Design a protein with these regions (language model features):
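Short, Lys/Glu-rich amphipathic helical modules
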Residues: 230-240
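Amphipathic alpha-helical segments
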Residues: 207-232
Length: 266
């Protein structure tokens, strides 16, 4: 019993149950988004977040923009528009984040409470630092900056080339299905203990089971079904499909029937 990853006592939380697996950060670069207020050194007091955000698209250059309060599991509830491509944004932002980050496919996760994730289909959203974004390493090939270099140095056990190669083997929709599963919530609890916050390091260290193309395709098809349903009707109940994903996830992690009952609260 000491190896059961779902045990929630502090003693048993530090388990090595899935030590042989790659972790999420081996597949994805994980980062906060931009901070849309003026940099204290470059433009002290010139503008605040509210000055850059509009409910509507207008003549000012803008991009679609989301915050954590706008997302939920498999959906984006609200979109606003952030000034972007002007003299002050992103040039004078306190944290602009590198521009290539906003032009590739990403998963988005919240930073407080229960983990929820969604998917940027068309690489079209800016997001602020209330959201943790994740992009496959392969999609950042050729992008060089201090943020990426520092992240690899601090958090990675693999080389960038190795992670880029590894990320060729997964689909973001597969990872989304894993991360939105009940078991991922348990794994997150194991990592953060009683903390209400979710940090990039928590996301990076969630173990991810290796899956064949066929195994991934099952989860991808279910995720696509949910995403398509939510696009048509954001309020649609997709709990049955999510339960199907949970069942696939349990198999990939090799959970026993008894462990599944614990995760399911039965």
């Amino acid at each position: 019993e000491k190896n059961f990853v779902w045990n929630l006592t502090q003693e048993k939380r530090n388990t090595n149950r899935h030590d042989g697996m790659y972790v999420f950060g081996d597949y994805c670069y994980v980062s906060y988004g931009l901070r849309p207020n003026s940099d204290e050194k470059k433009a002290k007091g010139e503008f605040k977040k509210e000055d850059l955000i509009s409910e509507f698209q207008d003549d000012i250059p803008r991009r679609k923009y989301i915050e954590a309060k706008d997302i939920y599991r498999y959906k984006i509830n609200k979109i606003r528009f952030l000034e972007y491509g002007t003299d002050r944004s992103p040039a004078k932002l306190v944290r602009p984040t590198f521009k290539e980050w906003f032009d590739i496919s990403k998963l988005y996760f919240n930073r407080l409470g229960i983990l929820v994730g969604t998917f940027d289909y068309d690489n079209k959203y800016l997001h602020n630092d209330s959201i943790i974004g994740a992009a496959l390493w392969k999609d950042l090939n050729g992008v060089e900056n201090k943020s990426i270099t520092s992240s690899i140095k601090k958090f990675s056990t693999m080389s960038r080339f190795e992670m880029e190669q590894l990320s060729e083997s997964v689909d973001l929709r597969f990872l989304l299905g894993i991360m939105n599963s009940k078991y991922a919530s348990v794994l997150l609890t194991n990592l953060r203990g009683g903390d209400y916050h979710i940090y990039p390091e928590h996301i990076r260290n969630i173990p991810i089971p290796t899956a064949t193309v066929e195994q991934q395709s099952v989860i991808i098809a279910l995720v696509e079904k949910i995403l398509n349903t939510k696009r048509i009707n954001p309020a649609a109940d997709t709990s049955m499909i999510e339960s199907e994903i949970d069942a696939e996830v349990y198999r990939l992690y090799g959970l026993s029937d008894d462990e599944i009952k614990i995760v399911e609260g039965r």
